[in-house]
A protein has these predicted regions:
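Terminal low-complexity/charged segments
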Residues: 1-222
Length: 222
């Protein structure tokens, strides 16, 4: 008898795994290969300690201590002319490292160069807000908290950005179910019609591959 495998979200699963597959890696280059980055690196190391530094995809990548993040952003903006924060977020490494990797993508309009700041944040720690330096960090920091649960200190309006304020858990964590949890399946029914309508409507269908001809009729029964 064949071993049973769960059929939930089958469209998200690879149909087979190649035993000869080798995960692709991005080459890293020495900073001395770029004259502008070499000067930036030299100035940076005089002011801050670095955990790692390299060039990747034409970006200068600097791995720093999360406690220095506000001073580093000030330095990049005022001293090294990286005057635009174009992206920031976090990566969930809770299972492997019990924390998050935060990254801040910077652009220098005068040098036409991009620099990425990376730092590690333990699960129960918090990072300082940089909204006082870059206004564009406001929504990004809120999204980081909303989707991943990253705590940000001294933010002017630290609340959820995308999900409702009373939403349970953080949807972009790797432990969050692809179809959502039980609270998610009943959220809109409870909010709009009340829990007494659960037996009439049924839980929300959250499997994107499911096709049910009755979905369009259920609300009509109210």
């Amino acid at each position: 008898m064949r071993k049973y495998t769960p059929k939930d979200n089958v469209q998200r699963q690879a149909p087979f795994s190649d035993r000869f597959f080798v995960s692709p890696s991005v080459p890293r280059f020495d900073i001395s290969n770029d004259e502008i980055f070499s000067k930036d690196y030299e100035s940076f190391t005089k002011a801050f300690k670095l955990k790692d530094a390299y060039i990747e995809h034409t970006h200068l990548v600097l791995n720093v201590d999360k406690n220095d993040i506000v001073e580093i952003m000030n330095f990049l903006s005022n001293e090294l002319e990286y005057d635009m924060l174009i992206e920031m977020s976090a990566i969930d490494y809770l299972a492997a490292k019990d924390g998050y990797e935060l990254f801040y993508e910077m652009l220098s309009l005068s040098k036409h160069k991009r620099l990425r700041i990376k730092c590690f944040l333990n699960k129960d720690d918090a990072v300082e807000s940089i909204t006082s330096i870059f206004d564009s960090a406001n929504w990004s920091e809120r999204e980081m908290y909303d989707m991943l649960g990253v705590k940000v200190l001294n933010h002017p309006n630290m609340k959820r950005l995308i999900m409702p304020d009373d939403w349970y858990d953080h949807p972009l964590r790797k432990t969050y179910p692809l179809q959502g949890d039980e609270a998610a399946s009943w959220y809109e029914v409870d909010k709009i019609f009340g829990k007494e309508a659960r037996d009439v409507i049924g839980p929300e269908q959250r499997d994107p591959a499911a096709i049910d001809r009755y979905d369009t009729e259920r609300f009509a029964r109210l």
